[in-house]
Amino acid sequence: MSAHPGKPGRYYLISYPRTASNLLLKILALDSQPNFSSGEVDGGYFFMPADDILIEPRIRARSIGDWTADERAQVKESFQACFEAQQQWLEATESQGRSVFVKEHTVFFADPTARSDLQFGPSPTREPAWTVEYAGGSTHSKLNITVLPDEFLLTWLPTFLIRHPALAFPSLYRTVIKREGKESAAADNFASLLTTVEWSRSLYDFYVQNRESLPCSPDQSLEWPMILDADDIIAHPATVALYCNKIGMDPRKLCFHWDQFKSEELSQIEPNQLAMRMSLYQSTGIDTSKSSRGINVDDEASKWRSEFGIAVGDHIEKLVRGAMADYEYLRARRLRADRG
Protein backbone atom coordinates (compact mmCIF):
# COMPACT_ATOMS: atom_id res chain seq x y z
CA MET A 1 0.00 0.00 0.00
CA SER A 2 1.48 3.37 -0.99
CA ALA A 3 2.00 6.21 1.45
CA HIS A 4 -0.85 8.22 -0.06
CA PRO A 5 -3.07 6.00 -2.25
CA GLY A 6 -3.68 7.64 -5.61
CA LYS A 7 -1.10 10.36 -5.01
CA PRO A 8 2.41 10.26 -6.53
CA GLY A 9 5.13 9.61 -3.97
CA ARG A 10 8.86 10.19 -3.76
CA TYR A 11 10.86 7.14 -2.72
CA TYR A 12 14.59 7.47 -2.09
CA LEU A 13 16.78 4.36 -2.09
CA ILE A 14 19.87 5.41 -0.14
CA SER A 15 22.84 3.07 -0.20
CA TYR A 16 26.60 2.81 -0.16
CA PRO A 17 28.57 1.20 -3.01
CA ARG A 18 28.35 -2.56 -3.62
CA THR A 19 25.15 -3.15 -1.68
CA ALA A 20 23.41 -4.99 -4.54
CA SER A 21 21.39 -1.92 -5.48
CA ASN A 22 21.53 -2.83 -9.17
CA LEU A 23 20.25 -6.30 -8.35
CA LEU A 24 17.36 -4.82 -6.38
CA LEU A 25 16.39 -2.58 -9.28
CA LYS A 26 16.61 -5.55 -11.62
CA ILE A 27 14.23 -7.51 -9.39
CA LEU A 28 11.82 -4.60 -8.94
CA ALA A 29 11.56 -4.31 -12.75
CA LEU A 30 10.79 -0.62 -12.54
CA ASP A 31 10.03 -0.34 -16.24
CA SER A 32 7.14 -2.73 -15.67
CA GLN A 33 5.81 -1.08 -12.52
CA PRO A 34 2.70 0.95 -13.29
CA ASN A 35 2.88 4.65 -12.45
CA PHE A 36 6.52 4.57 -11.32
CA SER A 37 9.58 6.22 -12.83
CA SER A 38 13.21 5.83 -11.79
CA GLY A 39 16.16 8.14 -12.22
CA GLU A 40 17.49 8.58 -15.72
CA VAL A 41 21.00 7.22 -14.99
CA ASP A 42 21.04 3.71 -13.50
CA GLY A 43 17.92 4.42 -11.49
CA GLY A 44 19.14 7.72 -10.10
CA TYR A 45 22.67 8.85 -9.27
CA PHE A 46 21.81 12.48 -9.94
CA PHE A 47 24.86 13.55 -7.93
CA MET A 48 27.39 11.30 -9.63
CA PRO A 49 28.83 14.19 -11.70
CA ALA A 50 29.85 15.94 -8.48
CA ASP A 51 31.42 12.74 -7.18
CA ASP A 52 33.33 12.39 -10.45
CA ILE A 53 35.09 15.65 -9.58
CA LEU A 54 35.67 14.70 -5.96
CA ILE A 55 37.34 11.40 -6.83
CA GLU A 56 39.88 13.05 -9.11
CA PRO A 57 43.32 12.43 -7.53
CA ARG A 58 44.07 16.17 -7.35
CA ILE A 59 40.98 16.69 -5.18
CA ARG A 60 40.67 13.52 -3.12
CA ALA A 61 44.28 13.62 -1.93
CA ARG A 62 43.71 16.87 0.01
CA SER A 63 41.38 17.94 2.79
CA ILE A 64 38.76 20.54 1.99
CA GLY A 65 40.79 23.21 3.77
CA ASP A 66 43.55 22.78 1.19
CA TRP A 67 41.36 23.19 -1.88
CA THR A 68 41.89 26.25 -4.04
CA ALA A 69 39.14 28.82 -4.53
CA ASP A 70 38.61 27.55 -8.07
CA GLU A 71 38.31 23.94 -6.88
CA ARG A 72 35.77 24.90 -4.23
CA ALA A 73 33.75 26.84 -6.78
CA GLN A 74 33.88 23.94 -9.24
CA VAL A 75 32.55 21.48 -6.65
CA LYS A 76 29.83 23.83 -5.40
CA GLU A 77 28.66 24.59 -8.92
CA SER A 78 28.56 20.89 -9.75
CA PHE A 79 26.42 20.04 -6.72
CA GLN A 80 24.01 22.87 -7.55
CA ALA A 81 23.78 21.76 -11.18
CA CYS A 82 23.10 18.17 -10.09
CA PHE A 83 20.38 19.32 -7.72
CA GLU A 84 18.72 21.48 -10.35
CA ALA A 85 18.79 18.62 -12.84
CA GLN A 86 17.11 16.41 -10.25
CA GLN A 87 14.51 19.10 -9.56
CA GLN A 88 13.68 19.46 -13.25
CA TRP A 89 13.34 15.70 -13.64
CA LEU A 90 11.09 15.47 -10.59
CA GLU A 91 8.83 18.24 -11.83
CA ALA A 92 8.52 16.69 -15.28
CA THR A 93 7.86 13.20 -13.93
CA GLU A 94 5.43 14.18 -11.19
CA SER A 95 3.47 16.38 -13.61
CA GLN A 96 2.58 13.12 -15.36
CA GLY A 97 1.11 11.75 -12.12
CA ARG A 98 3.89 9.21 -11.64
CA SER A 99 5.64 8.27 -8.39
CA VAL A 100 9.43 8.34 -8.42
CA PHE A 101 11.88 5.75 -7.15
CA VAL A 102 15.41 7.12 -7.13
CA LYS A 103 18.62 5.66 -5.76
CA GLU A 104 21.69 7.50 -4.55
CA HIS A 105 24.86 6.46 -2.78
CA THR A 106 25.52 8.52 0.35
CA VAL A 107 29.02 9.26 -0.93
CA PHE A 108 27.55 10.93 -4.04
CA PHE A 109 25.55 13.59 -2.22
CA ALA A 110 27.56 13.80 1.00
CA ASP A 111 28.51 17.25 2.21
CA PRO A 112 32.20 17.78 1.27
CA THR A 113 33.01 18.84 4.84
CA ALA A 114 31.69 15.50 6.13
CA ARG A 115 33.59 13.74 3.38
CA SER A 116 36.81 15.50 4.33
CA ASP A 117 36.29 14.71 8.02
CA LEU A 118 35.81 11.02 7.22
CA GLN A 119 38.98 10.83 5.18
CA PHE A 120 41.32 13.18 7.04
CA GLY A 121 39.76 13.55 10.48
CA PRO A 122 37.76 16.49 11.85
CA SER A 123 39.28 19.89 11.16
CA PRO A 124 39.96 22.08 14.21
CA THR A 125 38.39 24.94 12.25
CA ARG A 126 35.48 23.04 10.73
CA GLU A 127 33.56 25.15 8.26
CA PRO A 128 29.76 25.14 7.99
CA ALA A 129 28.16 22.34 6.02
CA TRP A 130 27.70 22.92 2.32
CA THR A 131 24.06 23.13 1.24
CA VAL A 132 22.59 23.59 -2.21
CA GLU A 133 20.22 26.48 -2.81
CA TYR A 134 16.59 25.38 -2.54
CA ALA A 135 13.50 27.56 -2.55
CA GLY A 136 11.85 25.34 0.04
CA GLY A 137 14.35 26.05 2.82
CA SER A 138 17.97 25.94 3.92
CA THR A 139 17.98 24.12 7.27
CA HIS A 140 20.92 21.76 7.73
CA SER A 141 20.70 19.79 10.97
CA LYS A 142 23.56 17.84 12.53
CA LEU A 143 22.48 14.36 11.39
CA ASN A 144 22.03 15.51 7.80
CA ILE A 145 25.36 14.61 6.19
CA THR A 146 24.22 15.55 2.67
CA VAL A 147 24.37 18.74 0.62
CA LEU A 148 20.56 18.71 0.57
CA PRO A 149 18.62 20.89 3.02
CA ASP A 150 16.43 19.18 5.58
CA GLU A 151 13.31 20.55 3.94
CA PHE A 152 14.08 18.79 0.66
CA LEU A 153 15.05 15.49 2.28
CA LEU A 154 11.73 15.48 4.09
CA THR A 155 9.80 15.47 0.81
CA TRP A 156 10.98 11.86 0.34
CA LEU A 157 10.16 8.51 1.92
CA PRO A 158 13.57 6.86 2.38
CA THR A 159 14.73 3.27 2.21
CA PHE A 160 18.27 2.43 3.31
CA LEU A 161 19.92 -0.45 1.52
CA ILE A 162 22.73 -2.08 3.50
CA ARG A 163 25.12 -4.97 3.05
CA HIS A 164 27.70 -6.61 5.29
CA PRO A 165 30.84 -4.42 5.11
CA ALA A 166 33.06 -7.50 4.74
CA LEU A 167 31.39 -8.03 1.36
CA ALA A 168 30.73 -4.46 0.25
CA PHE A 169 34.07 -2.81 1.05
CA PRO A 170 36.51 -5.22 -0.63
CA SER A 171 34.14 -5.48 -3.58
CA LEU A 172 34.36 -1.72 -4.01
CA TYR A 173 38.15 -1.84 -3.88
CA ARG A 174 38.18 -4.42 -6.66
CA THR A 175 36.20 -2.08 -8.88
CA VAL A 176 38.61 0.77 -8.08
CA ILE A 177 41.53 -1.42 -9.16
CA LYS A 178 39.74 -2.22 -12.42
CA ARG A 179 39.13 1.48 -13.00
CA GLU A 180 42.47 2.94 -11.91
CA GLY A 181 45.01 0.17 -11.45
CA LYS A 182 46.61 -1.06 -8.22
CA GLU A 183 49.09 1.79 -7.79
CA SER A 184 46.56 4.60 -8.08
CA ALA A 185 44.01 2.72 -5.98
CA ALA A 186 46.45 2.52 -3.06
CA ALA A 187 47.85 6.06 -3.41
CA ASP A 188 47.37 8.87 -0.87
CA ASN A 189 46.45 6.54 1.99
CA PHE A 190 43.75 4.77 -0.06
CA ALA A 191 41.92 8.00 -0.88
CA SER A 192 40.14 6.07 -3.64
CA LEU A 193 38.35 3.85 -1.10
CA LEU A 194 35.91 6.28 0.46
CA THR A 195 33.05 4.26 1.91
CA THR A 196 31.20 4.10 5.19
CA VAL A 197 28.02 2.88 6.86
CA GLU A 198 28.16 5.76 9.33
CA TRP A 199 26.48 8.15 6.91
CA SER A 200 23.60 5.74 6.32
CA ARG A 201 23.04 5.45 10.05
CA SER A 202 23.22 9.22 10.52
CA LEU A 203 20.64 9.83 7.78
CA TYR A 204 18.46 7.02 9.12
CA ASP A 205 18.47 8.65 12.55
CA PHE A 206 17.71 12.00 10.92
CA TYR A 207 14.60 10.55 9.34
CA VAL A 208 13.55 8.79 12.56
CA GLN A 209 13.76 12.11 14.39
CA ASN A 210 11.62 13.75 11.71
CA ARG A 211 9.01 11.04 11.14
CA GLU A 212 6.13 13.41 11.81
CA SER A 213 7.25 15.58 8.88
CA LEU A 214 7.40 12.78 6.31
CA PRO A 215 4.95 12.79 3.37
CA CYS A 216 2.77 9.93 4.54
CA SER A 217 -0.33 9.45 6.63
CA PRO A 218 0.10 9.45 10.43
CA ASP A 219 -0.72 5.75 10.70
CA GLN A 220 2.13 4.95 8.31
CA SER A 221 4.78 7.25 9.74
CA LEU A 222 6.20 4.59 12.08
CA GLU A 223 7.02 2.41 9.05
CA TRP A 224 9.49 5.00 7.82
CA PRO A 225 12.37 5.11 7.26
CA MET A 226 12.72 1.53 5.97
CA ILE A 227 15.84 -0.63 5.76
CA LEU A 228 16.57 -3.45 3.34
CA ASP A 229 19.53 -5.78 3.74
CA ALA A 230 21.14 -7.24 0.63
CA ASP A 231 21.00 -10.67 2.25
CA ASP A 232 17.20 -10.53 2.22
CA ILE A 233 17.13 -9.41 -1.40
CA ILE A 234 19.31 -12.39 -2.27
CA ALA A 235 17.71 -15.05 -0.10
CA HIS A 236 14.23 -13.90 0.92
CA PRO A 237 12.01 -12.87 -2.01
CA ALA A 238 9.07 -12.53 0.37
CA THR A 239 10.77 -9.49 1.90
CA VAL A 240 11.06 -7.82 -1.50
CA ALA A 241 7.40 -8.59 -2.18
CA LEU A 242 6.44 -7.08 1.17
CA TYR A 243 8.48 -3.99 0.36
CA CYS A 244 6.68 -3.66 -2.98
CA ASN A 245 3.33 -3.69 -1.25
CA LYS A 246 4.41 -1.04 1.22
CA ILE A 247 5.51 1.43 -1.45
CA GLY A 248 2.68 0.77 -3.87
CA MET A 249 4.49 -1.35 -6.45
CA ASP A 250 3.02 -4.53 -7.91
CA PRO A 251 4.74 -7.66 -6.49
CA ARG A 252 3.47 -9.63 -9.49
CA LYS A 253 5.89 -7.66 -11.66
CA LEU A 254 8.96 -8.78 -9.71
CA CYS A 255 11.62 -10.40 -11.87
CA PHE A 256 13.88 -13.12 -10.46
CA HIS A 257 15.15 -14.55 -13.76
CA TRP A 258 16.48 -12.77 -16.83
CA ASP A 259 18.55 -13.24 -19.96
CA GLN A 260 22.31 -13.01 -19.78
CA PHE A 261 23.86 -10.11 -21.69
CA LYS A 262 25.34 -11.11 -25.04
CA SER A 263 28.95 -10.26 -25.90
CA GLU A 264 27.86 -7.62 -28.42
CA GLU A 265 25.73 -5.95 -25.75
CA LEU A 266 28.61 -5.96 -23.27
CA SER A 267 30.89 -4.34 -25.85
CA GLN A 268 28.59 -1.30 -25.96
CA ILE A 269 28.75 -0.66 -22.20
CA GLU A 270 31.03 2.00 -20.75
CA PRO A 271 34.08 0.37 -19.02
CA ASN A 272 33.48 1.80 -15.54
CA GLN A 273 29.88 0.63 -15.61
CA LEU A 274 31.01 -2.76 -16.84
CA ALA A 275 33.43 -3.05 -13.92
CA MET A 276 30.64 -2.37 -11.43
CA ARG A 277 28.01 -4.64 -12.97
CA MET A 278 29.73 -7.46 -14.83
CA SER A 279 28.55 -10.18 -12.45
CA LEU A 280 24.95 -9.00 -12.87
CA TYR A 281 25.24 -8.76 -16.65
CA GLN A 282 26.60 -12.30 -16.84
CA SER A 283 23.92 -13.75 -14.57
CA THR A 284 20.51 -15.19 -15.33
CA GLY A 285 19.14 -14.87 -11.81
CA ILE A 286 20.04 -14.32 -8.17
CA ASP A 287 23.34 -15.77 -6.98
CA THR A 288 22.67 -16.92 -3.42
CA SER A 289 26.40 -17.35 -2.78
CA LYS A 290 26.63 -13.55 -2.58
CA SER A 291 24.98 -13.46 0.85
CA SER A 292 26.94 -12.90 4.05
CA ARG A 293 25.70 -16.09 5.69
CA GLY A 294 28.52 -17.67 7.69
CA ILE A 295 30.97 -14.87 6.95
CA ASN A 296 33.83 -14.36 9.42
CA VAL A 297 35.81 -11.12 9.33
CA ASP A 298 39.00 -12.80 10.61
CA ASP A 299 38.88 -15.33 7.78
CA GLU A 300 38.01 -12.68 5.20
CA ALA A 301 40.84 -10.40 6.34
CA SER A 302 43.33 -13.17 5.69
CA LYS A 303 41.91 -13.50 2.16
CA TRP A 304 42.19 -9.75 1.57
CA ARG A 305 45.85 -9.76 2.50
CA SER A 306 46.45 -12.60 0.08
CA GLU A 307 44.48 -10.90 -2.68
CA PHE A 308 45.56 -7.28 -2.27
CA GLY A 309 48.70 -7.37 -0.15
CA ILE A 310 49.23 -6.79 3.55
CA ALA A 311 48.86 -2.99 3.57
CA VAL A 312 45.62 -3.00 1.60
CA GLY A 313 44.22 -5.96 3.51
CA ASP A 314 44.95 -4.26 6.82
CA HIS A 315 43.27 -1.07 5.65
CA ILE A 316 40.13 -2.85 4.46
CA GLU A 317 39.95 -4.81 7.71
CA LYS A 318 40.17 -1.57 9.69
CA LEU A 319 37.34 -0.03 7.66
CA VAL A 320 35.17 -3.14 7.98
CA ARG A 321 35.59 -3.49 11.72
CA GLY A 322 34.94 0.22 12.16
CA ALA A 323 31.68 -0.09 10.22
CA MET A 324 30.24 -3.15 11.95
CA ALA A 325 28.49 -1.34 14.81
CA ASP A 326 26.61 0.92 12.40
CA TYR A 327 25.78 -2.02 10.14
CA GLU A 328 24.44 -4.13 13.01
CA TYR A 329 22.42 -1.17 14.28
CA LEU A 330 20.72 -0.79 10.91
CA ARG A 331 20.40 -4.52 10.27
CA ALA A 332 18.50 -4.99 13.53
CA ARG A 333 15.88 -2.54 12.22
CA ARG A 334 15.54 -3.94 8.72
CA LEU A 335 12.29 -4.88 7.02
CA ARG A 336 11.61 -8.61 7.29
CA ALA A 337 8.72 -10.61 5.87
CA ASP A 338 8.49 -12.67 9.05
CA ARG A 339 7.65 -9.60 11.10
CA GLY A 340 5.94 -7.37 8.53
Swiss-Prot record:
Family annotation (InterPro entries): P-loop_NTPase, Pyrrolopyrazine_biosynth_F
One Gene Ontology molecular-function label: transferase activity
Cited SUPFAM superfamilies: P-loop containing nucleoside triphosphate hydrolases (SSF52540)
Keyword line: Transferase
Pathway noted in the entry: Secondary metabolite biosynthesis
EC assignment: 2.8.2.-
Primary role: Sulfotransferase; part of the gene cluster that mediates the biosynthesis of pyrrolopyrazines, secondary metabolites showing insecticidal activity. The role of ppzF within the pathway has still to be determined. The single multifunctional NRPS ppzA is sufficient to produce peramine via condensation of 1-pyrroline-5-carboxylate and arginine, N-methylation of the alpha-amino group of arginine and reduction of the thioester and the cyclization to form an iminium ion resulting in release from the peptide synthetase.
UniProt signal peptide: none
Species this chain originates from: Metarhizium rileyi (strain RCEF 4871)
Protein name from the UniProt record: Sulfotransferase ppzF
UniProt entry tagged with the keyword Transferase: yes
Keyword Transferase found: yes
